[in-house]
Structure formats: structure tokens, C-alpha cells
Amino acid sequence: FMQSTGARIGGGAYGTRPSTTAYLRFLADHARSKGTVFREVPEEWLLRRGMLAVQTLVEDKDTYLTRPDLGRVLSEASLQTVREHYRPAPQVLIVLSDGLSTDAVLANADEIVPPLTNGLRQAGFTVGDPLFLRYGRVKAEDRLGEAVGCDVVLMLVGERPGLGQSESMSCYAVYRPTAATLESDRSVISNIHREGTPPVEAAASTAPAKSG
């Protein structure tokens, strides 16, 4: 059972304290999870993929954690950049955001974005070039969708990391979002990573769902 799961079970203890192996594993997992929250997606990574990048009103990771409201809002300059780039408006806009896990972006983007884009196009949708949003919260997809004028926004965002898993991503889908969009209006596929829902499988599940 222990070999089939990464869950923290059967660590052993000596009296009231955990075993040295279990304790060191805990410290290592905690460091990895903390690191992915504060790590930045490199500019070189974005340039190699030719992705347009915009940013919310957040200026750094510390502000992102302490002011979640700023992660839901983009500057007018950023919104204007997006409006000009996506002309004419595509039916579907794919947004990639670091959120709370940079590892999720770096580990999964290349495995989910291409098949997701291709699947939607094969289903007959027009799909814009993927957009990268730095320091984004889920609500920011509403502002982007409204600015572009698309029918659907798919936001791929890094999830809050747990001990032992720092690469998990979620896909939030919303139809014709506005400032009045509610959280209950979104559909979500979560736990996207190699040991959860594989990125390619998540892409295959998402594309048909939008064609129905």
C-alpha cells in the first residue's frame, strides 16, 4: 500500500517524535512546495514559446499572497494589449497563469496546451494564441474574456501546492464571462499533473466538453 501512494503514511515514530526519515522527507516536501509558490516563470521560457504575456496589478509574489484582490484585476494598458492582439476575437481564449505554482506551468504546459488547442480547432472552434497571465487569480479570466469578446475562456492555473505535490494545475472554463460572473458559473478540472489527471487526458476531456 505504501508503494502505491505518495501519501504520508507508515512513516514510523520513536516515542512521540517521527522517524528521522519521515521528518527529513517532510522538510524536503515543505521546501519544494514553498519554493514553487515564490518561483517566477522565466521570461526565456515564455519567449521560446512565443507567448504574449500580460500581468495583473500585482507587482511581486509577496503582494500576490497578501492582496488576492489585485490578482483579479488587470491594468487598462494590459487589457488594451489583449484587445489589439486578439482581433478578430476567437471563440475560445486559453489563458495560462502561474497562480500558486510555477512548477505546474513548467511541468504541464507543453503537454496540455497543444492538444487542447488542436482538439478545440478540430471540433470547429476558432482558438486564439495562448496567453500568459502573470500573478493571476481565477477571476481575472472574466476580465480577459470580456475584453477580448470571446465565447469561452479556459484558464490553466497552478494550484496551491501540497506536501509532496507541487505540480498540480486546474482548468477553469467559463462561458461569456463578465464582471458579474459568479464562481458557480465556472466548470473545473482539477488535480492535473502526471500522478493525477494526466495533462493530455485533461485536454481530451476539455475539448469535447466545449463542443457539446
Residue map of PLM features:
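N-terminal charge/polar-biased segments
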Residues: 1-7, 80-90, 204-212
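Active-site loop/lid in soluble adenylation, ligation, and acyl-transfer enzymes
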Residues: 1-79
